[in-house]
Amino acid sequence: MTEKKPIRTLLCIAVLQNFFDLPFDQTGPVWTATKQFLAAVHKMPGVTVLGTIDDDETMVGTSPTGFPWTCYLLGDFPDREAVVAACNLFRTIEVGDQGHRLWRYMRIEARMGRPLPTPEL
């Protein structure tokens, strides 16, 4: 039997206008929920998180629709269902005590594929 290869996945996360409309002293719960999301993905069975990046330093190249993405998580997921489950966390993680979910303040997109071969140097 052939061993099932993990799916290399890039989770792209964008901060929505609802976050920017919050008074500064009310943004903390969104960051707390974001950390909860990251921790949950790290703990998912069969998921290996390879790295994260917040692109608030510099972006090089064109972005025809502005700056849609804010941060990224690159990981190997055991299957498509695990990727869907990770994205679904935005629907279930609560932000603060107002009954809002993380997806009110951020959106997520998953890009699934395979690693490129590493060139021999």
Regions found by a protein language model. Give the residues of each.
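Conserved short hydrophobic interaction patches
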Residues: 37-40, 89-93
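A generic "cationic amphipathic patch" detector
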Residues: 24, 86, 94-96
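Conserved catalytic core of two-metal-ion nucleotidyltransferases
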Residues: 104-112
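Short amphipathic alpha-helices within nucleic acid-binding modules
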Residues: 79-89
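Short S/T/G/P-rich N-terminal loop/turn motif that feeds into the first structured element of a domain
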Residues: 1-69, 77-81, 111-121
